[in-house]
Amino acid sequence: MMAARLLGTSSRIFKLNKHLHTSKVAFMPVVQFKLSDIGEGIAEVQVKEWYVKEGDTISQFDKVCEVQSDKAAVTISCRYDGIVKKLYHEVDGMARVGQALIDVEIEGNVEEPEQPKKEAASSSPEAPKSSAPKAPESAHSEGKVLATPAVRRIAIENKIKLAEVRGTGKDGRVLKEDVLKFLGQVPADHTSGSTNIRTTHQAPQPSSKSYEPLKEDVAVPIRGYTRAMVKTMTEALKIPHFGYNDEINVDSLVKYRAELKEFAKERHIKLSYMPFFIKAASLALLEYPSLNSTTDEKMENVIHKASHNICLAMDTPGGLVVPNIKNCEQRSIFEIAQELNRLLEAGKKQQIKREDLIDGTFSLSNIGNIGGTYASPVVFPPQVAIGAIGKIEKLPRFDKHDNVIPVNIMKVSWCADHRVVDGATMARFSNRWKFYLEHPSAMLAQLK
């Protein structure tokens, strides 16, 4: 009898366990938040800083971590509400696109709806947005709407039917961002798991001691901008370089800038010499478009670029970075100065945006800010030409009467890809650039 009872009890327990194991878990699931595609062919990034730790409560749009790609510092924001259960990488570790950054335990049911609806493909263009939000076609007319309690609470507080909100999460899940978009509180170009260039971190302040002697050898990982420089310069070694040097009398430019400096100050514009160098280069490129070019990967074509996106080799706390000022041929000297100042400020804070680093067509490097006269700049592939500008020096020169007079002299060093640029073209371009700097008022004649 006792054995029979035990067998009966065991059978009931087995059936109960079987029933429990076949039930779907409908609460507190753990999801992986993965590193989304940053773009520009970037496959991996370095984790510079975590803004969360295991056990922290996190919400949608909260910052998760800051990563450093070869081109820019990027802040990764979350797309879930929940609790951080696991961090997958250490600080300074490398994370690959598509791999998990963190595990998040989220509230709500993640099981698929019993009768998922297949959305019909629409060929009609999206209607323009009006001031009052218009309900999109329901994506949840059949089955259960997937959303966390936090999202449902926002919907209830704003008297919104979640069935009218198109979910962009997995399996049509409605995210907080979707509800806020529906309310018109979030710009349309904001995306979950967005990668925003950081805006809060400042460049590290220098300590009172300018250096600290090393007591032993230190291995420094090649990361961030330096890693990008390694790749670029390795490619540049494949280019046969042609060099050309010259000097420019910038007496007139010094006076011209002094006249405009106060006028620029009234407009809150810091006016250095660099905007003049950039504008003069752009005007000269109009006459020699073969220098405002890029080559294709197979070296079968040289693409003459319509836009003058002039790159500036910039020294930053994170290493060398080469952003560019777009459409210099359409900008005035003051407009170029404003854009230059923006890039310089962003470089100091390591906040250079990705769009500022792409599509460059020609490069200038102002080594004169640090010192030096001549240099041997390296072409920035796939571009075909670069110039290095030395410091302005007061040097003795002969006037037309053979008298020795003091003259403001600036030296320039050009380098070009000798596979596609001949020496004569580089020399003629340099002469035209030199003419505009020695006669700065001539630049005004070119303005439209």
UniProtKB/Swiss-Prot annotation:
Give the sites modified to N6-lipoyllysine: 71
What compartments host this protein?
Answer: Mitochondrion matrix; Cytoplasm, Cytosol; Cell projection, Dendrite; Cell projection, Cilium
Q: Which Pfam families match?
A: 2-oxoacid_dh, Biotin_lipoyl, E3_binding
Q: Which residues form the active site?
A: 418, 422
Q: What is its EC number?
A: 2.3.1.168
**Low complexity bias locations:** 121-136
Amino-acid positions noted as binding CoA in the UniProt annotation, renumbered to this chain: 257, 272, 315, 365-366, 390, 392
Using the UniProt record, name the top-level EC class of this enzyme in a single word.
transferase
Ranges for domain Peripheral subunit-binding (PSBD): 146-183
- Keyword Transit peptide present in the record's keywords: the answer is yes
Would you tell me the protein name for this molecule? Answer: Lipoamide acyltransferase component of branched-chain alpha-keto acid dehydrogenase complex, mitochondrial
